[in-house]
Swiss-Prot record:
Disulfide bonds join 18-24. GO terms for cellular component: extracellular region. Has antibacterial activity against the Gram-positive bacterium S.aureus ATCC 25923 and the Gram-negative bacterium E.coli ATCC 25726. This is Brevinin-1PTb. Belongs to the frog skin active peptide (FSAP) family. Brevinin subfamily. It is found in: Secreted. It comes from the Eukaryota.
Length: 24
């Protein structure tokens, strides 16, 4: 589940995901 959620997040909001997870 988390894997799919991460993929969706990185595709829809790459900048936000980068800032939240600190993984760029």
């Amino acid at each position: 589940f988390m894997g799919g959620l991460i993929k969706a997040a990185t595709k829809a909001l790459p900048a936000a995901f980068c800032a939240i997870t600190k993984k760029c």
